[in-house]
Amino acid sequence: IRRQRQMCIRDRFMLGAKAVQMGTHFVATEESIVHENYKNAIIKAKDIDSRVTGRSTGHPVRALRNQMTKKYLDLEKNGASFEELEHLTLGGLRKAVVDGDVTNGSVMAGQSAAMVKEIMSCKDLIQKLVSETDALIGGKGFYE
């Protein structure tokens, strides 16, 4: 899995990217104020565990699969109104982030959540990413 993350970052740089999005990984750091249940849900996630809800409303959101996403996708599939969908998700992020309800709350996370395997400090995460990517790319100086 670590190799997959390294390759993913390297490949994007080789295609001309100047940066990669790492929000999900930083949510699961020691410094993040989200509930421990949220962090643990990310760490336990498999590569098939994220779902996109809200396509029908024009406001897509990627979140980890749970009861809330299942209900939302069922409602969306059956043509529920914007108001019905809004009612289901109202306060959903707070439920997950503050209350730790990762079953009924909105556990927003990117496609790469499965690559997050441990809670570490932001400093350690950045150092690890830089050293792993440098090793793959071929040494220092790539980022300058």
State what each model feature region is.
Residues 1-9:
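Single conserved hydrophobic/aromatic residue that forms the stacking wall/gate
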Residues 10-144:
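Conserved active-site-proximal phosphate/metal-binding subdomains
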